[in-house]
């Protein structure tokens, strides 16, 4: 469950290391985001010579959350850290690689490019 002021790791090679959620997109009263949701983030920590720099405001897709994700078959999946992948205005990933596993719930939200770049889909 991601809300405003939540810090997330960045799971791609865009150059950002840590971001902070500043808005959950999808309705004026929407409070929480989960896997597959698009949020607006501010870059809080970045590496030198990356594609993004500290202070940039971008969109991101949440790919891992610590909160339990319940599946229709009754199973539950949860991750150790909250993580997101930066995207541009055309909903394409800014980076060219994705690090770590991503859940298959991203497929239902039409983030196929992220699924195809990920090394493991749970």
UniProtKB/Swiss-Prot annotation:
Keywords: Ribonucleoprotein, Ribosomal protein, RNA-binding, rRNA-binding. CDD domains: Ribosomal_uL14. GO terms for molecular function: large ribosomal subunit rRNA binding; structural constituent of ribosome. GO terms for cellular component: cytosolic large ribosomal subunit. InterPro entries: Ribosomal_uL14, Ribosomal_uL14_bac-type, Ribosomal_uL14_CS, Ribosomal_uL14_sf. GO terms for biological process: translation. Belongs to the universal ribosomal protein uL14 family. Part of the 50S ribosomal subunit. Forms a cluster with proteins L3 and L19. In the 70S ribosome, L14 and L19 interact and together make contacts with the 16S rRNA in bridges B5 and B8. Binds to 23S rRNA. Forms part of two intersubunit bridges in the 70S ribosome. This is Large ribosomal subunit protein uL14. It comes from Rhodopseudomonas palustris (strain HaA2). The gene is rplN.
